[in-house]
Design a protein with these regions (language model features):
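Hydrophobic alpha-helical packing residues
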Residues: 57-62, 127, 266, 346, ...
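Acidic, Mg2+-coordinating active-site environments of NTP-dependent enzymes
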Residues: 110, 118, 131-138, 154-242, ...
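ATP-dependent carboxylate-amine ligase catalytic core
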Residues: 18, 22, 26-37, 63-152, ...
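Beta-strand->loop->alpha-helix junctions that form or flank phosphate-binding loops
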Residues: 71, 194-195, 207-229, 245-250, ...
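N-terminal leader/targeting and accessory segments in enzymes
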Residues: 1-48, 52-67, 76-78, 93, ...
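C-terminal helical cap/extension that packs against the catalytic core
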Residues: 194-207, 211-216, 230-234, 299-302, ...
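Active-site-proximal loop/hinge segments that shape catalytic or ion-binding/gating pockets
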Residues: 408
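Nucleotide phosphate-binding/pyrophosphate-handling subdomain across enzymes
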Residues: 38, 134-137, 145-158, 162-166, ...
Length: 422
């Protein structure tokens, strides 16, 4: 199979959508001899920050000398990014071979796997066959009934910042969502939690007590910023002084605190991770599309924030790094997001909006988004294509100005490709 044929099969229309439950992926992996049971894991869930936290953890573990797998979603530039070993995406020929192997197994299942379940099975099989020492595995959505929860008890079950998102599936309260996400906590693991409201923390604590799993909460009081510019951050956390992190924004320091707390938990469980590996790993962390500066003159920033909590962080970062600067906002969003609350955060900082339609079946049409954004009293232009939107953004932004591309991770890859062509 060619790569195009592989991706066409993976994205088959009849497999689209999310169907919670572990029976299908468990059956599929069982047909392969359950390769997922032969690997160690860090399992990471949360509403915001889980991808960045995964990237930091994988980078530190790699710096410590461990063969480290990383499983995340969605991708920005190429599908292969979703599964990596030591920072390298799965090769095209390996991906093709795995799909050719799994295809007949999946096709003969009475209850066939969803797209996410198939992709997860591919990743878990690859990591096992490559004999990874440890895999950092990001939950797709929720936790308890997410396909990634087919893995055995992880070394650490990490819960990043929890808020309201995917409410039609996960629940309408933060506590209900936390209960679903806490489903990744299993007997034999150690849970790590981003500090949260007492009612939410109690939900997680109840799950930990039920599973007999110890719980460690990251200590944000031990976190302090030393230096913060568009080139990166220097910070202290507990005994760690002068740590460097290329990811920008105060929210990334809090994510780093969760990652460092997880590293301490791994040490308690016998993993050898020295301070030099921590320093090197954090300094080398790469996670595109999170307040990422991709061009200067004008300054162009990509941010994949896609819910109100993300927009709070984005707005805070704009105020911190670009105080008083008018910002051109190129944006697109998925229709099922709470985009009203999202743009309430961003509108006061926007000089103008340019709307586009992300390449996703759930995308809100650019014209409909433009009509909504006009309520904020700022100039709004709807563009028929992302490339047209990027051209308009560059025309509307002076050389000493700033443009922010945001609203959906599904938008960013096309923005970068368009920037390379205009």
């Amino acid at each position: 199979m060619t790569l195009d044929e592989v991706l066409a099969y993976i994205h088959k229309v009849d497999w689209r959508g999310s169907v919670p439950g572990l029976s299908r992926i468990d059956t599929l992996l069982g047909l392969l001899g359950h390769p997922e049971r032969h690997v160690k894991y860090i399992h990471v869930t949360g509403t915001n920050g889980k991808g960045s936290t995964c990237a930091m953890l994988a980078s530190v573990l790699r710096a410590a000398g461990y063969k480290t797998g990383l499983y995340t979603s969605p991708y920005i530039f190429r599908f292969n990014e979703r599964m990596q070993i030591n920072g390298a995406p799965i090769p095209d020929d390996t991906l093709s071979a795995l799909v050719e192997e799994l295809r007949p197994l999946a096709d003969r299942m009475a209850d066939p796997p969803t797209e996410f379940e198939l992709v997860t099975a591919i990743g878990l099989t690859w990591f096992a066959r490559e004999m990874c020492d440890i895999v950092v595995c990001e939950v797709g959505m929720g936790g308890e009934f997410d396909a990634t929860n087919v893995i055995p008890a992880p070394e650490a079950a990490v819960l990043t910042n929890i808020g309201l998102d995917h409410t039609s599936v996960l629940g309408n309260t933060v506590e209900a969502i936390a209960a679903t996400k806490a489903g990744i906590i299993k007997p034999g693991c150690h849970a790590v939690l981003y500090p949260c409201a007492p009612s939410v923390q109690e939900v997680v604590a109840v799950r930990c007590r039920s599973a007999g799993a110890p719980l460690t909460v990251a200590d944000f009081d031990a976190l302090s910023s030393v230096c913060d510019t568009l080139e990166g951050q220097i910070f202290n956390y507990g005994p760690y002084k002068g740590l460097r992190l290329p990811l920008l924004g105060g929210h990334q320091l809090r994510n780093a605190a969760v990652a460092l707390t997880t590293i301490d938990v791994l040490r308690q469980r016998g993993w050898h991770i020295g301070e030099s590996a921590v320093r090197q790993g954090l300094a080398q962390t790469a996670w595109p599309g999170r307040f990422q500066v991709v061009r200067r003159q004008p300054t162009i920033i990509l941010d994949g924030g896609h819910n109100p909590q993300c927009m709070v962080s984005l707005a805070a970062a704009i105020r911190e790094y670009l105080p008083g600067q008018p910002v051109t906002v190129l944006t697109g969003v998925l229709a099922d997001k709470d985009y009203g609350k999202m743009y309430d955060q961003l509108a006061p900082l926007a000089a103008r909006f340019i709307t586009v339609t992300p390449h996703n079946p759930r995308a809100l049409d650019a014209g409909e988004l433009a009509a909504f954004l006009r309520r904020y009293g700022k100039p709004v232009t709807a563009c028929g294509t992302i490339r047209e939107g990027v051209s308009r953004m560059l025309a509307d932004t002076p050389p000493d100005g700033t443009a922010v591309c945001c609203g959906s991770l599904y938008l960013l890859g096309d923005v970068v490709q368009s920037l390379e062509k205009v």
